[in-house]
A protein has these predicted regions:
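Extracellular receptor-binding modules and their adjoining Ser/Thr/Gly/Asp/Asn-rich linkers
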Residues: 1-39, 93-102
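Generic structural motif
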Residues: 32, 45-47, 60-61, 88, ...
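Short proline/glycine-enriched turn/loop motifs at strand-loop junctions of beta-rich domains
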Residues: 46-52, 92
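Short, exposed beta-strand/loop patches in secreted or surface proteins that constitute
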Residues: 10-18, 66-78
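Exposed aromatic-hydrophobic patches
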Residues: 37-46, 85-86
Length: 102
């Protein structure tokens, strides 16, 4: 299992949705990400948040191509503002996580 952080991804894009009470983060993981095994660790405090409101994960079927929603048991836990997210699915592919935090 590999722990991917915002330093080992393609970066984090943020959108401040203050009127709705949360921030949206978009995190791109590289094609070496092993779905169902690897985890994504994000320090939410770096982005002005402390807890998760929701997570969606999209896995690429082929590099840079079609994405499918990884619906097979995406799990997460937050401790001291650090979110650890493990997505379901299988295969070694790139993908995108959409994270809503407050």
């Amino acid at each position: 299992m590999t722990n991917f952080t915002d330093g080992t991804t393609s970066g984090v894009v943020t959108k401040d949705m203050t009127n709705l009470g949360f921030k949206q983060l978009q995190v791109r993981v590289p094609d070496t990400f092993v779905w169902g095994t690897d985890s994504l660790i994000i320090d939410l405090t770096d982005y002005g948040a402390v807890d998760l409101a929701g997570v969606l994960a999209f896995e690429e079927t082929t590099e840079g191509s079609v994405t499918i929603q990884a619906t097979e048991g995406t799990t997460s836990v937050t401790s001291a503002g650090v979110a650890t997210i493990v997505s379901g699915g299988d295969g070694t592919n790139g993908g995108t996580f959409l994270i809503w935090a407050y």
